[in-house]
Amino acid sequence: MKRIATPSLTSRLLVAARSGVSPATAAIRSRSAISVRSQSTAALAQHDASHDLNNDRFPPLEPLPPAAESLPSPLPERALTSAKLAALHARLNLSPKIPLQTLARTLVDASADENPQFNNANLAFVGQTLINYHIAEWLLCKYPRLPQGILFSAMKAYAGPKPLLQIARSWGVDTAAVPGGEVDPGLLQFDALKPGVAITNFGYKRTELAYLEKFKWRRGMASRVVLDDDFGDVVRSDPKVAADLEKAMEEQDQDKTPDEEEAEMVANEQDQDVSYDRYGNPDTRAAAERAHAYFVRAVVGAIYAHCGREAAKAFVKAHIMSRTLDIAKLFEFKYPTRELAALCAREDFEPPVARLLSETGRQSRTPVFVVGIYSGSDKLGEGAASSLDHARFKAAMNALKAWYLYSPGENPRVPSDMLEEGAKPWTPAYIDMGEVISR
């Protein structure tokens, strides 16, 4: 009797059937065994060699010091190995005199690290002073007849927190999710939930600030110049002082009727619902805006500290003053005809007279009237609108804008030009006596 030659797999299935194991389970075990046996020592050696090759090409990162994670900001020596920081230094075309450690310090906000020796508060104060000074002297010499309120608005449009935020983003600066010692020094580090230490601003803190915001008291231009900051805005009090004032106001408001309290609660709930969206709440957005603005100011302060006055002025001109701003859109007149009449009386001009220059479609749905404002034989302004009164108002507004936006030239000399070596003798700049009607 001849034996039948069966494959090894079939024999294992037969053995499994005798032992009570299902054929499917036996097949799976056999496949796993086959796959395990197919591996060899040569394959393992080849895998280890490729792993070593990758380590040679891409070495692992250097381990951080044991106490780095507990620090509020990265160590200064880590700035020398940051690719982001080196790229930012080259992108801004900074001088080699500015070390990477100083540039890394400009990226550490006071809310991330409260130590003034490691954050950018001091550099930001120097930079803020330089930026506001150069922009103020340039605006005053270029537009000597600007009203004080428009001057404040123009300065804020150039050097306020929002334009500085746009400048920082145009530089390609990324933000860290959470500040700490393990963060890359090339990232902007700030705490969105903690206000931090604000830099010192010029101006005085009003004791009536809480009542000023609640009752919308009017602030005169003289008080804005003397008491408020460089942009004519109210200098905010410390959080503790503001909380005490708010608590005192709440105690005075205890005599409200139930209907008034219910209406106020509904309004507060609506404000809370609107304040939170996909981009955070107003507090976190304000913290990010403030951190970016402090960073730009700190960069200017670092340039001044390491490279001098002229380098800082050139940087401000290239990155801040070069931005386009239509100052004519900042004007808002309430009584343009009365203000124009007062201006003509102050300057000893003949009283302004409105004259109809041309018209079309008076009896149609879309008439157009062109009105000109004349002082004697001199034409002061011209405006077109769908009604005679509106055209007269537009002509008066255009005449006032033409007066206030007078400029002696595109690049006038400023007082800081006298600090240069070999500067020409100073010629006093023309500065107008100011606006006609104070707003």
Curated annotation (Swiss-Prot):
Localization per Swiss-Prot or TrEMBL: Mitochondrion
One Gene Ontology CC term in the entry: ribosome
Record field: compositional bias (Acidic residues): 258-274
Pfam families reported for this sequence: dsrm
InterPro entries documented for this protein: dsRBD_dom (IPR014720), Ribosomal_mL44_DSRM_fung (IPR044443), RNase_III_dom (IPR000999), RNase_III_sf (IPR036389)
Keywords on record: Mitochondrion, Ribonucleoprotein, Ribosomal protein, RNA-binding
Family: Belongs to the ribonuclease III family. Mitochondrion-specific ribosomal protein mL44 subfamily.
Protein name from the UniProt record: Large ribosomal subunit protein mL44
Record organism: Neurospora crassa (strain ATCC 24698 / 74-OR23-1A / CBS 708.71 / DSM 1257 / FGSC 987)
Gene: mrpl3
